[in-house]
């Protein structure tokens, strides 16, 4: 009888541990989603200049007279097996104090040397934004690059996360010491954002991607750290296909 009671108590204890662990996971997932929703609920912003009138999270890092700067970045990376990782993207710095935007378009080819160390070959093309149009600030002789800049759209302009709450059972990671956190979800090719990416980029795989929400800093909000979203289509040794995007609010360098 005593053995039976011990067995029952052991099962109950194990059940409680599993329940508490699962509950903590669900709680962290909800907090991570809530942290990202503050920014993702703004998507899509078709006219980027609307960000001049939008304020992000402010903390003690901001001067009281500083309206802050939005930093936008989107990039597509593709690596066929045995080849270099080819990356194309753009970063803009939107200063709300001066209502001016500058940044750069970049092209990179990353390949490991004989010792396995990654060697980059990044080229940057400075740009500015006027009347919601992105314009090179220096002459570009390469017509293809010039056209890519003129036609470039940030994910924030067409992405939509109204169904973020429907993403369930994600792989959750949280490290309170850094702090860092992430949530990963398996998507389908019918997902709205996946369709939008395939519409705009030549993605050489039919595999549906995983959506990764990752960040550092206080979950409740912080100007220190970052928040990124990533759509990972392929992740293998010497073979990768992913799209990453970020929209963060930081103190301005020139007040």
UniProtKB/Swiss-Prot annotation:
Point out the signal peptide segment: 1-23
A GO cellular-component term linked to this record: plasma membrane
- Report the principal subcellular site: membrane
Q: Where found, per UniProt?
A: Cell membrane
Entry annotated with the keyword Membrane: yes
- Highest rank taxon of the organism: Bacteria
Kindly give the PROSITE patterns that the UniProt entry links to this protein: PROKAR_LIPOPROTEIN
Query: Where does the record place the S-diacylglycerol cysteine lipid attachment?
Result: 24
Entry membrane topology: Lipid-anchor
**Gene3D superfamilies, per database record:** 2.50.20.40
Which family is this sequence assigned to?
Belongs to the staphylococcal tandem lipoprotein family.
Q: Return the protein name.
A: Uncharacterized lipoprotein SAOUHSC_00054
């Amino acid at each position: 009888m005593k053995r039976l009671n011990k067995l029952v108590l052991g099962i109950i204890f194990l059940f409680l541990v599993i329940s508490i662990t699962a509950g903590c996971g669900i709680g962290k997932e909800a907090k991570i989603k809530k942290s990202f929703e503050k920014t993702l609920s703004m998507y899509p912003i078709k006219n980027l200049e609307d960000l001049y009138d939008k304020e992000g999270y402010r903390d003690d890092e901001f001067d009281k007279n500083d309206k802050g700067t939005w930093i936008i970045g989107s990039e597509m990376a593709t690596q066929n097996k045995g080849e270099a990782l080819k990356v194309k993207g753009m970063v803009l710095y939107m200063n709300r104090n001066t209502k001016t935007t500058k940044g750069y378009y970049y092209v990179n080819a990353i390949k490991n040397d004989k010792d396995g160390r990654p060697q980059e070959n990044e080229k940057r093309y400075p740009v500015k934004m006027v009347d919601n149009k992105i314009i090179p600030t220096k002459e570009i002789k390469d017509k293809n690059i010039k056209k890519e800049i003129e036609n470039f759209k940030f994910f924030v302009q067409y992405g939509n996360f109204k169904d973020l709450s429907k993403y369930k059972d994600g792989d959750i990671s949280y490290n309170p010491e850094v702090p860092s956190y992430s949530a990963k979800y398996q998507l389908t090719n019918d997902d709205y954002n996946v369709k939008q990416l395939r519409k705009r980029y030549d993605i050489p795989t039919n595999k549906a991607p995983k959506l990764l929400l990752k960040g550092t800093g206080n979950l409740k909000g912080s100007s220190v750290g970052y928040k990124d979203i990533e759509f990972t289509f392929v992740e293998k040794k010497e073979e990768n296909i992913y799209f990453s995007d970020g929209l963060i609010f930081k103190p301005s360098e020139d007040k």
